[in-house]
Amino acid sequence: MHLKSFEVVQNVLTFLIIPFLGIIVGIASIPGVWMFLEARAYLVDQVYWLELFGTGISLGLACVVWGITLVLMSGLLGGLFRPRLEPGRYPLRSFVTIQWAWSMVFHRVAILFLPVLVPSFVGTIYYRMAGAKIGAGCQINSPHLNDAGSVVLGDGVVIGGNAIINAHLVEKGELVMAPVKIGKGALIGGNSTVQPGCTIGEGAVVANRAV
């Protein structure tokens, strides 16, 4: 479906999304803020050096709790709102593009802290919540598995640092959507790029910085 006033819709939604992102970040901060305030209530009557160290440590821990909460919230929301689109080519100026862009908003929020959490089980949980199918023993050392709901990783896959996995691209006025499938034991080198529609065989190696 083409949208005749696509730019207007795009600008209005962008204006609305910015405060929405602030709300998500704020809600995610609640556990960390609570922990910090509880620590401050205890530390305020302590000797100065203990109050100083305790405040610094509690601030640091609160930031970590905020980041983990933000990433997991983003994964949950991204999974709930991800578009169930069939592989294909869609007009860029269409409602499909708006659906896709909306789902990517949550990944952009997660990237505020996700780079700190990869590779780790928290990062893997995030990608699974966002819709990725991830086999056992995978190591994901990148915050750039875009369109997670269209990514399939077999057992033992290794994604190198800052590798980019895209299940979408834009060309000739169209949004192209196609799943990415990576077979068991494959290695995707650091800073490499895998484009939509790629199927990488079992045990294959994609060199660093390859496209």
Predicted features and spans:
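Terminal amphipathic alpha-helical/low-complexity segments used for targeting or macromolecular assembly
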Residues: 1-128
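Structural signal for interior beta-strand "rungs" in well-ordered beta-sheet cores
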Residues: 126-129, 133-211
